[in-house]
Amino acid sequence: MARKAMIEKWKKTPKYSTRAYTRCRICGRPHSVLKKYGICRICFRELAYRGQIPGCKKASW
C-alpha cells in the first residue's frame, strides 16, 4: 500500500522542480534507475535477459 501511495505521489508535479526524482516505471523503485530506459537495474536485467530490450546483450570478456 505504501508503495502505491508513493507512486501516486510521484506522478504529481512537485511544487519545485528540484523535488522531482526518477522512479522505475515497472516496479516503482526509487534507487538505481537508468535514465535512458526509465527502469531500475533489476527490471533492466530481467528484460535484457529475456531479449525484450533491443540492441542490448550481455557483456563478456
UniProtKB/Swiss-Prot annotation:
One of its GO terms (biological process) is translation. Its cofactor is Zn(2+). One of its GO terms (cellular component) is small ribosomal subunit. One of its GO terms (molecular function) is structural constituent of ribosome. This is Small ribosomal subunit protein uS14. Keywords: Metal-binding, Ribonucleoprotein, Ribosomal protein, RNA-binding, rRNA-binding, Zinc. Binds 16S rRNA, required for the assembly of 30S particles and may also be responsible for determining the conformation of the 16S rRNA at the A site. The gene is rpsZ. InterPro entries: Ribosomal_uS14, Ribosomal_uS14_bact, Ribosomal_uS14_sf. Part of the 30S ribosomal subunit. Contacts proteins S3 and S10. NCBIfam families: PRK08061.1 (NF005974).
